[in-house]
Amino acid sequence: MVMINFQHIDGEALLAQLQPLLGNIRGKLTPNVEMRKVTWFRTGGLAELFYQPVDEEDLALFLHNLPECVPVTIVGIGSNLLVRDGGVPGVVIRLSPKNFGQVQQVSSKGFLVGAGTADKHLAAAALKAEIAGFHFYHGIPGGLGGALKMNAGANGVETAARVVEVYALDRKGQRHILSLKDMHYSYRHCDIPEDFIFTAALLEGEPGNKDAIRAAMDEVALHRETVQPIREKTGGSTFKNPKDTSAWRVIDEAGCRGLQIGGAQMSEMHCNFMINTGQATGYDLEALGETVRARVFAHSAHLLQWEIERIGQFEQGRSVASFDPFH
């Protein structure tokens, strides 16, 4: 029986307990990995264990053999991710572009795409195949797994518009095939069981003209270059847009453009982008985000919701309270 204290990060001890139980897994299992090295913010504590499966079959075996008491956290490219300074207990599973980054054309307008595929690589593959409708991925700084989970979108198009089927594993390693209807998509959200791990998806666009597709991608790239701090350490859009306006607008109107806590700052260029100016901690970033939420609510009664995913536990004595005006 596995007896583990997940309040204290001790990857070596956890690895020693789990190795005899995991069977013939083929992926790389590493203790005490610095999460700052795998996130775009370049912040965060240790992953107690860090697993990189080689394929879906390997991941299924790992999940099947992993005791249910062990917490599991999934990461991909690490763009839309804030890792807290106290680290991530249990196992962090990363679906890498190397092992889950295939883009296979399966029809005149469709691709089978691995969840570890960078969005911009999907856009490039669609350009090469002259399949329209994927240009917006050229402007999303992330991977397909995250795009499927949050219904990522840009330039008026969302991931839901391209999905035919999504392939997932549950916490026990069982495979599931989800239709577009099964995903229950809404703005920056899908409603599926929390333990599901996306491994790939069947996506479809429309036959297109290469010059027109390239022009659409160039327009996306120019927009990003002009209005977003793409050369900074950032996680992309910090908050979801409210129903009746843009997040950046209410942030700006509340006087939060350029607001800074420690090494974290709301970008002067695009104030819905939070940046690490050099030495930010996870605490700095999350404290800044919650401060912005409070100021925006006080100014306009808009309650901003995080778009960036926050994982892990706080460092002892340095927790950040989530702003809640109703309690």
Curated annotation (Swiss-Prot):
Cell wall formation. It comes from Bartonella tribocorum (strain CIP 105476 / IBS 506). Its cofactor is FAD. GO terms for biological process: cell division; cell wall organization; peptidoglycan biosynthetic process; regulation of cell shape. One of its GO terms (molecular function) is FAD binding. InterPro entries: FAD-bd_PCMH, FAD-bd_PCMH-like_sf, FAD-bd_PCMH_sub1, FAD-bd_PCMH_sub2, MurB, MurB_C, MurB_C_sf, Oxid_FAD_bind_N. It is found in: Cytoplasm. Belongs to the MurB family. Residues 42-223 form the FAD-binding PCMH-type domain. Its EC number is 1.3.1.98. Keywords: Cell cycle, Cell division, Cell shape, Cell wall biogenesis/degradation, Cytoplasm, FAD, Flavoprotein, NADP, Oxidoreductase, Peptidoglycan synthesis. This is UDP-N-acetylenolpyruvoylglucosamine reductase. Pfam families: FAD_binding_4, MurB_C.
